[in-house]
Amino acid sequence: MGRKKIQITRIMDERNRQVTFTKRKFGLMKKAYELSVLCDCEIALIIFNSSNKLFQYASTDMDKVLLKYTEYNEPHESRTNSDIVEALNKKEHRGCDSPDPDTSYVLTPHTEEKYKKINEEFDNMMRNHKIAPGLPPQNFSMSVTVPVTSPSALSYTNPGSSLVSPSLAASSALADTSMLSPPQATLHRNVSPGAPQRPPSTGSAGGMLSTSDLTVPNGAGSSPVGNGFVNSRASPNLIGTTGANSLGKVMPTKSPPPPGGGSLGMNSRKPDLRVVIPPSSKGMMPPLNTQRISSSQATQPLATPVVSVTTPSLPPQGLVYSAMPTAYNTDYSLTSADLSALQGFNSPGMLSLGQVSAWQQHHLGQAALNSLVAGGQLSQGSNLSINTNQNINIKSEPISPPRDRMTPSGFQQQQQPQPPPPPPQAPQPQPRQEVGRSPVDSLSSSSSSYDGSDREDPRGDFHSPVVLGRPPNSEDRESPSVKRMRMDAWVT
């Protein structure tokens, strides 16, 4: 849209006329300058305004131009206003500087057809240009690796919805296991997609985490998040699940019981520890305050291998290990005393006994546990069995006094006789864990009645930090804490 054309008549307003004169006078001189330079000609411009004031312009020297003008006697073109107006009206060159006829400005049927064709081609080009960017996304596919957790993933809410992780829910869209295949031999707790599918836990008692709270896919199936061990790597996670009526027992070291399994296990030696434990299933412990999870600790990844070996549907009261043997080989049946004796272990591969009813029916993939249990391996089978091809001094009697043993991994073991389970008691608040504790040491049974009786005072003889991991293919890949089996054939 061009500028509005004014009517070429005398301007009546004095002020407007003066402004228009100043602007157009300069424009005229500018055009004269351009013409003189472009066409190599001499121009002399003489202007008298309405008050007889002189304004002149000369491309070179006014006197020379005027002298040449006066001495010129040849026929030449001379025009006045009437000539210009007549030329403009006749040739319909309105607004054109030159009165000469120019066929390019005349719209003939041929030129109109040519312009229409140009416009159509331009419209087609613009239409194709707009559609082209939209085509590649329609046929484009890219594998995306979504981190399992984010620094803001560990948010603790009421006991009914224990852990809420937006990144975990976001990873549910990645069903292809090839997108989520992590490295196997790293020391990060990356779990390969070979982990079998585990249906959610069934029981929920006393306001514990139910199966509808959070379900995380691990490439081949889903498992509920229970005891708060969240894998912060970009891989499908093998999370130790603790149901409402299940165990949160931790094997590594003896220590005073955390309040109903509702405290955080913070190891000051492991600044990258992140552990959150659900409150007691019996309703005796109020939910954790979110202030208990400091930002510096909540944003750190796990640095300790954690395996949660789950048991099928344990009752909320009574002997907590009663249903344990049903998930494993009957050749290695375990009693509650045997399992209780496992508490004295100090080993790099911790064993957290949780509960999810589906693990008794599926394989624990060897590849899925190599990167979780540092140096520890669970042989694959329909029932969880133990590879006993090395000399591990792990024989224990439930009623024997405490005695020191040395495992192949160099960690000192202590056995503790287990008293009969006392009645459930209200948990007591506990300060931060001591330095020598392992990252998963703060786990306790969510619904167990061993809350206050199966742990000793904080240990001072934990003289070795938790080993992050050994090569999965080494000779010493079996961790003594993978399973404490009652086998009299194993000599001490």
Curated annotation (Swiss-Prot):
Residues where Phosphoserine is found: S59, S98, S235, S255, S347, S400, S438
DNA-binding region: 58-86
Keywords: Acetylation, Activator, Apoptosis, Developmental protein, Differentiation, DNA-binding, Isopeptide bond, Neurogenesis, Nucleus, Phosphoprotein, Transcription, Transcription regulation, Ubl conjugation
GO molecular function: chromatin binding; DNA-binding transcription activator activity, RNA polymerase II-specific; DNA-binding transcription factor activity, RNA polymerase II-specific; DNA-binding transcription factor binding; histone acetyltransferase binding; histone deacetylase binding; protein heterodimerization activity; protein kinase binding
Presence of the UniProt keyword Hydrolase in the record: no
Repeat among keywords: no
Membrane-spanning parts: none
Record's function text: Transcriptional activator which binds specifically to the MEF2 element, 5'-YTA[AT](4)TAR-3', found in numerous muscle-specific genes. Also involved in the activation of numerous growth factor- and stress-induced genes. Mediates cellular functions not only in skeletal and cardiac muscle development, but also in neuronal differentiation and survival. Plays diverse roles in the control of cell growth, survival and apoptosis via p38 MAPK signaling in muscle-specific and/or growth factor-related transcription.
Protein name, entry field: Myocyte-specific enhancer factor 2A
Source organism (scientific name): Bos taurus
Gene behind the chain: MEF2A
